[in-house]
Swiss-Prot record:
It comes from Legionella pneumophila subsp. pneumophila (strain Philadelphia 1 / ATCC 33152 / DSM 7513). Mg(2+) binds at E40, D113, E116. Residues 5-127 form the RNase III domain. Pfam families: dsrm, Ribonucleas_3_3. Residues 154-224 form the DRBM domain. This is Ribonuclease 3.
Length: 224
């Protein structure tokens, strides 16, 4: 296991002074009481701060809302798991037998949590400067991506642009049902496109939210 940890350190481009921090950051709760749950809590805050600070400096003309959406996009679980897979993090996790048999080393939530825990371990071992350097290294391609601001567009706008680029008809949103009490209504919307077989659905506390969710579902279907 020592060789594996050394290999992971090379992938992270970081040498631990206290390897115990890394071992705990890699230990799932199914594998023992000295697990990564507390590290995950700390790592989540460290990551959020570093990304927020970087976005604040990179995009001086963005509003608070735009910066918040960019940060949410970059620190969401799916993004963390994607980065974790790039460094083969699942190969180094300490899992209980049940989690191991069920493929926990591939699970998005576990990979995301473990990556946050590792960031906390680096912070505890080497301080904030070290943690920031590693975070920016891991995120460099995403922060430099010219399409990063694409996530600022809402789902209906993204779907419309995709359809126009693909020479499809524009989507139609139909309110199919409203249920619940007046103060807690649920709106149901169907999204269809002429000439396209797929149908998407969205539900939300208002029509606008339901349409956005239906558009998001349709875009995911079309993009596969």
């Amino acid at each position: 296991m020592k060789i594996n940890l050394e290999r992971l350190c090379r992938r992270l481009n970081y040498h631990f002074n206290n390897i115990a921090y890394l071992k705990q950051a890699l230990t799932h709760c199914s594998a023992g009481s000295d697990n990564y749950e507390r590290f995950e809590f700390l790592g989540d805050s460290i990551l959020s701060f570093v990304i927020a600070n970087e976005l604040f400096n990179r995009f001086p003309l963005h509003s608070e809302g735009q910066l918040s959406r960019l940060r949410s996009f970059l620190v969401k679980g799916e993004m963390l798991a994607e980065i974790a897979r790039e460094i083969d993090l699942g190969d180094y996790l300490f899992l209980g037998q049940g989690e191991l048999r069920s493929g926990g080393f591939r699970r998005t939530s576990i990979l995301a949590d473990a990556l946050e825990a590792i960031l906390a371990a680096i912070y505890l071992d080497g301080g904030m400067i070290a943690a920031k350097q590693i975070i920016l290294m891991l995120y460099s391609s995403r922060l430099d991506d010219p399409d990063l601001n694409h996530c600022l567009k809402d789902a209906k706008t993204q779907l419309q642009e995709f359809l126009q680029a693909s020479k499809f008809a524009l989507p139609e949103y139909v309110l199919t049902k409203i249920e619940g009490d007046e103060h807690a209504q649920i709106f149901h919307v169907t999204c269809t496109i002429e000439g396209v077989s797929q149908v998407a659905y969205g539900t939300g506390p208002n029509r606008r939210k339901a349409e956005q969710l239906a558009a998001k579902a349709m875009l995911e279907q079309l993009q596969g």
